[in-house]
């Protein structure tokens, strides 16, 4: 079985999870519809102002609602930043390999922008493969966000890199940035090498 064949569809996994949780996402509404709703409710108006800010965001129809700009592996002991640019050539990322020293603690940081409408239930999903077999699946709930000019930043909880002779080697990751409506905001692939030392 090839690595491609071994990779399940994200939608199938999410459907299974949603049915177990009996979760039904709310219907999607545009930013304008949300702003028009409950105008007479002072507390809701205040909440929406807090979420959306004072300045209306210009909705450029050519820009996607959610733009994922970069992913970083945050580790205090790393000799330099470990960052991948997600606005350029995603195919090139498949040829690069990022390095983590075995056993170190690190966090995944994702930078993204919401450009037009409020997006509900953003999540980051990562499938990890080794020699074509899936060895891990992680799902991180990112949350709901309104549009604004500045980027948002999401940090996962602290994780520990695998360690030991058997854990060292190269892992292939398939990452998804999606939401409650199963909108695929970005899917990309990248490689991570677990080594005995940073400079090995």
UniProtKB/Swiss-Prot annotation:
One of its GO terms (molecular function) is small GTPase binding. Disulfide bonds: none annotated. Preferentially expressed in hematopoietic cells. Keywords: Acetylation, Cytoplasm, GTPase activation, Phosphoprotein. Residues 30-39 have a biased composition (Basic and acidic residues). The modification Phosphoserine is found at residue 144. It comes from the Eukaryota. InterPro entries: Ig_E-set, Rho_GDI, RhoGDI_dom_sf. Transmembrane segments: none annotated. Residues 1-39 are annotated as: Disordered. The modification N6-acetyllysine is found at residues 20, 24, 39, 46, 101, 123, 174. It is found in: Cytoplasm, Cytosol. One of its GO terms (biological process) is regulation of Rho protein signal transduction. Pfam families: Rho_GDI. The keyword Phosphoprotein applies. The modification Phosphotyrosine is found at residue 23. One of its GO terms (cellular component) is cytosol. The modification N-acetylthreonine is found at residue 2. Interacts with RHOA. Interacts with RAC1. Interacts with RAC2. Interacts with CDC42. PANTHER family: RHO GDP-DISSOCIATION INHIBITOR, RHO GDP-DISSOCIATION INHIBITOR 2. Belongs to the Rho GDI family. Regulates the GDP/GTP exchange reaction of the Rho proteins by inhibiting the dissociation of GDP from them, and the subsequent binding of GTP to them. Regulates reorganization of the actin cytoskeleton mediated by Rho family members. This is Rho GDP-dissociation inhibitor 2.
